[in-house]
Amino acid sequence: MIINFVGNTLIIFNEDIPCDLLRKKYKELFVPTISVLDFKKKRLYRKYNNIFLYTYKNYSFLWELENNILHKVQKCLNKNGILKLIIYLNKNDVITPDKHENKNNNDIKVNIDQKDYCENYINDIFKNIKKECLYNGFINIVNETSVAENGIILNITAENPDFLSNEDNDVSSDDEDLYNNEDDKKKVVNRVCDNCTCGKKEKLLNSENKVLINEKDGEYITENVVSSCGNCYLGDAFRCASCPYKGLPAFQPGENVKLNLNNESN
């Protein structure tokens, strides 16, 4: 059974004779094909909108844990891409018990409704495959069963989801601009206690572009000092209680200001 397909499609065939015949027909139509074995071994460098997987009788490889083919198919599909599983079940392989012995003996044979049994058998197969598809990230998994000349065909369709909404996709570099905000770039200066004993005050005073010390005059001459609150230059009304500039008039940002150590107690 050859399926009408759209562009950007890959056909995967299991290693069996009926699938080999289909492979030749698809090659005549210039449709890319690959065997299940090669698909699992080779590395593909492109993604497809549609992947069809044909298998005849044998479908147990669909739930092999190691190198799971459904997982690789999902990785090779574009978002919202479609996986189509075409599984042919031979009529003789669908085990259909048609006899049960009556417990009352007398060798009475009871016919079992073969149609109902086949439906249950097919439903069990579909449930197992659906579970494997869900485990590997597929959604919207449906099955359409059709009757062939000597068997039954399961046409299982699954979709590779695109969980990113339009709003999520609209996330742009604007978020990075938030981190480039000038307010975030303000240099943070840790304040030092007046009676510092840990040595932090000494390190701060000796670091370059911080404070110049004039021990003879008992004065601090500030140079390029960055205020921790940013309000020191505005005047006492805007200064905190422990501000070293307390009592000094307002000054221009970046202006050198002398602090008299002798008046520190005042």
Curated annotation (Swiss-Prot):
Organism of this sequence: Plasmodium falciparum (isolate 3D7)
Protein name: Anamorsin homolog
Cx2C motif 2, short sequence motif: residues: 240-243
Extent of motif Cx2C motif 1: 229-232
Cofactor(s) in the UniProt record: [4Fe-4S] cluster
Binding positions ([4Fe-4S] cluster): 229, 232, 240, 243
Comment text on domains: The C-terminal domain binds 2 Fe-S clusters but is otherwise mostly in an intrinsically disordered conformation.
Region (N-terminal SAM-like domain): 1-164
Known function: Component of the cytosolic iron-sulfur (Fe-S) protein assembly (CIA) machinery. Required for the maturation of extramitochondrial Fe-S proteins. Part of an electron transfer chain functioning in an early step of cytosolic Fe-S biogenesis, facilitating the de novo assembly of a [4Fe-4S] cluster on the cytosolic Fe-S scaffold complex. Electrons are transferred from NADPH via a FAD- and FMN-containing diflavin oxidoreductase.
Linker, as annotated region: 165-185
